[in-house]
């Protein structure tokens, strides 16, 4: 789900090491548009850490990753024709594109769409219940104590739902990130 097309997946394979070398993870990559007005959209973030920090990117992070990605793309020239590069944070109501996302955000509300009918439907909304093997767990909204599991391979779209709990978690992540950034700044001033 990080890339929809083979071209997207090839670009992810090329650019993952670039992002990782800078301390970021590519959440999603999409090369959109036809032969004209193409746009390469990359969503990235800092990895989530045990202390709750990470997960977001600021403008400086986006610019840093954009410059590094541009250098690699200019050298390899894997995209035919002109295109615009956009690097951004996935945002608070982010897409869930990797199996680990369903574990990292367990306990939060999400919308999930499958590529096939399961439990009589393709679309679900509920609280993420984590991961078991390659199965994504969801406590279905409106159902009493019903948790269903779907193979991750069936998921074609998934996104967190904006809730108070999500806003609170986002605020905690930003606070932890600011604290970490301030510690890094203090250490560099001491040097």
UniProtKB/Swiss-Prot annotation:
Pfam families from the UniProt entry: DUF150_C (PF17384), RimP_N (PF02576)
Bilayer-spanning residue ranges: none
Major localisation: cytoplasm
InterPro entries (UniProt xref): Ribosome_maturation_RimP, RimP_C, RimP_C_sf, RimP_N, RimP_N_sf
Keyword terms, alphabetized: Cytoplasm, Ribosome biogenesis
Keyword Cytoplasm in record: yes
GO biological process, one term: translation
A GO cellular-component term linked to this record: cytosol
CDD domains for the chain: YlxS_C (cd01734)
Highest taxon listed in the record's lineage: Bacteria
Keyword DNA damage belongs to the record: no
Localization per Swiss-Prot or TrEMBL: Cytoplasm
PANTHER family in the record: RIBOSOME MATURATION FACTOR RIMP
Alphabetical list of HAMAP family matching this protein: RimP
Record family assignment: Belongs to the RimP family.
Function: Required for maturation of 30S ribosomal subunits.
Name this polypeptide is given: Ribosome maturation factor RimP
Organism of derivation: Caulobacter vibrioides (strain NA1000 / CB15N) (Caulobacter crescentus)
Gene: rimP
């Amino acid at each position: 789900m990080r890339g929809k097309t083979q071209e997207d997946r090839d670009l992810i394979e090329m650019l993952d090491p670039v992002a990782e070398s800078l301390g970021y993870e590519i959440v999603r990559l999409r090369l959109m548009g036809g032969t004209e007005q193409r746009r390469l959209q990359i969503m990235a973030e800092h990895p989530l850490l045990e202390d709750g920090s990470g997960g977001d990117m600021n403008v400086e992070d986006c610019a840093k990753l954009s410059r590094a990605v541009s250098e690699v793309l200019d050298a390899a020239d894997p995209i035919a024709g002109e295109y615009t590069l956009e690097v951004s944070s996935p945002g608070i109501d982010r897409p869930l594109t990797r199996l680990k996302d369903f574990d990292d955000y367990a306990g939060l509300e999400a919308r999930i769409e499958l590529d096939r009918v399961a439990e009589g439907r393709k679309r679900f909304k509920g609280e993420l219940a984590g991961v078991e093997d390659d199965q994504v767990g969801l406590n279905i909204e409106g159902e009493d104590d019903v948790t269903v599991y779907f193979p991750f391979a069936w998921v074609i779209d998934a996104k967190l739902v904006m809730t108070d709990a999500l806003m609170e978690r986002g605020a905690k992540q930003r606070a932890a990130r600011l604290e970490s950034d301030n510690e890094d700044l203090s250490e560099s001033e001491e040097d």
